[in-house]
From Swiss-Prot:
Residues 1-56, 106-152, 241-282, 336-382 are cytoplasmic. GO terms for biological process: detection of chemical stimulus involved in sensory perception of smell; signal transduction. This is Putative odorant receptor 85d. The chain crosses the membrane at residues 57-77, 85-105, 153-173, 220-240, 283-303, 315-335, 383-403. It comes from the Eukaryota. It comes from Drosophila melanogaster (Fruit fly). Residues 78-84, 174-219, 304-314, 404-412 are extracellular. Keywords: Cell membrane, Membrane, Olfaction, Receptor, Sensory transduction, Transducer, Transmembrane, Transmembrane helix.
Length: 412
């Protein structure tokens, strides 16, 4: 009984602990560390760990890009010879996925200094004590973000390892269960190398290399998306807290100076959140654009593969790939929509709070805040695209146009 009570009290104490900022960033950090990368400077990083991560990162990138080049050569040769058209189009889906993953890794490593500044500013805004955190409802925001993240990376891990391990499982079933010693060796992804990879230990080397490359690419993609969504979730949390703080203020019961100080603090807080959104867009804008462009092509090519008739095992993997592409788009669009809604709520909160008895000068100043809040903060894929749930329908329309074109080319 004493042990159970101790366990329960330990759990209760754990719940009562303040939630650090790191809790929002831990999923992204785990995937970045798996490829030997740190997206931003950590406070307590040791020199030997940084050196080890650096060389791990170089090895992972060399392997990933070697696999990418071999896949590209396969596609060029297939198109040039006019053969293996279906395999080439399937490879284009994988190539698009790898190129975007490669680009995201490069983009985040290039923006490390700026990302460190954003995380530092969020750390300064983050309430530290349990009593301070209560009005922010941090536990609710963290649990919501965690659910999205776990489903997101869980689906993609199932996807990548379904592709990676399919032929290994096929080999084990045929060899050890069915006793079929003669069957064609296959790799997870079609590629070209200047030697016969299907004989000897070369096959195992190529298989492991493609598996490691696929996981590295996936880690770069997942980490970038989850890091961006974590930062957006934190900014949304602050917008919601600011709205509640404004609505709870009763103006006019104290001096004008007291109301003016409240307004100054509110405007400074609002401006800091707006600047954070701008920095997030500058860090992730190009990455977001590549996300949506590549997703449209992936949806198109995978949809094409599904309509031309495939084996049941290939069809299952294609459906999984298509589903993951859609999950990625919806997750980013959902967080972008929440940012728009939360930032627009500032103007509504200013209008709703008790300002009727306030000084005329105070009331005039409120108009400026409402006017600024009518221009909501948004996630932007550079200057070309404002992201929201409406963007998803635009993406699906674009994907269908590419699909119709590809289908026509195949029929003709």
């Amino acid at each position: 009984m004493l042990t159970k009570k101790d366990t329960q009290s330990a759990k209760e104490q754990e719940k009562l602990k303040a939630i650090p900022l790191h809790s929002f960033l831990k999923y992204a950090n785990v995937f970045y560390l798996s490829i030997g990368m740190m997206a931003y400077d950590h406070k307590y990083s040791q020199k030997w760990k940084e050196v080890l991560l650096h060389w791990t990162f170089i090895a992972q990138m060399v392997n990933l890009n070697t696999v990418l080049i071999s896949e590209l050569i396969y596609v060029f040769l297939a198109i040039g010879k006019g053969s293996n058209f279906l395999e080439a189009t399937m490879n284009l889906s994988f190539i698009g996925f790898v190129i975007v993953g490669d680009f995201k890794i490069w983009n985040i490593s290039r923006q490390r200094k700026r990302l460190t500044q954003v995380v530092s500013r969020l750390e300064e805004l983050h309430p530290q004590g349990l009593a301070q955190q209560e009005p922010y409802n941090i536990g609710h925001h963290l649990s919501g973000y965690s659910r999205y993240s776990k489903f997101y990376f869980g689906m993609h891990m199932v996807l990548i390892w379904t592709y990676n391990l399919y032929w290994a499982v096929y080999y084990l079933v045929c060899d050890f269960w069915l006793g079929m010693r003669q069957f064609e060796r296959m790799l997870p992804y079609y590629c070209w190398v200047p030697w016969d990879w299907s004989t000897g230990y070369s096959y195992y080397f190529m298989y492991i290399s493609q598996n490691i490359g696929g996981q590295a690419c996936l880690s770069g993609q997942l980490a970038a998306d989850m890091l961006m969504c974590a930062l957006v979730t934190l900014v949304v949390m602050h917008f919601i807290r600011l709205s509640a703080h404004i609505e709870s203020h009763v103006a006019g019961i104290g001096s004008f100076q007291h109301d003016l100080e409240f307004l100054q603090a509110t405007v400074a807080y609002h401006q800091s959140l707006i600047h954070l959104c701008q920095d997030i867009n500058e860090i992730f804008g190009v990455s977001l654009l590549s996300n949506f462009v590549s997703s449209s092509f992936i949806i198109c090519f995978v949809g094409f593969q599904m309509t031309i008739g495939s084996k049941i095992d290939n069809l299952v993997m294609l459906v999984l790939f298509l589903f993951c592409a859609m999950v990625q788009v919806f997750m980013i669009a959902t967080h972008a929509q929440r940012l728009v809604d939360a930032s627009e709520q500032i103007g509504q909160a200013v209008y709703n709070h008790d300002w009727f008895r306030a000084d005329l000068r105070y009331r005039k100043m409120l108009i400026l805040i409402i006017k600024r809040a009518q221009q909501p903060s948004r996630l932007k894929a550079t200057m070309f695209l404002n992201i929201s749930l409406v963007t998803v329908s635009d993406l699906l329309q674009l994907s269908y146009k590419f699909f119709a074109l590809l289908r026509t080319m195949y029929v003709n």
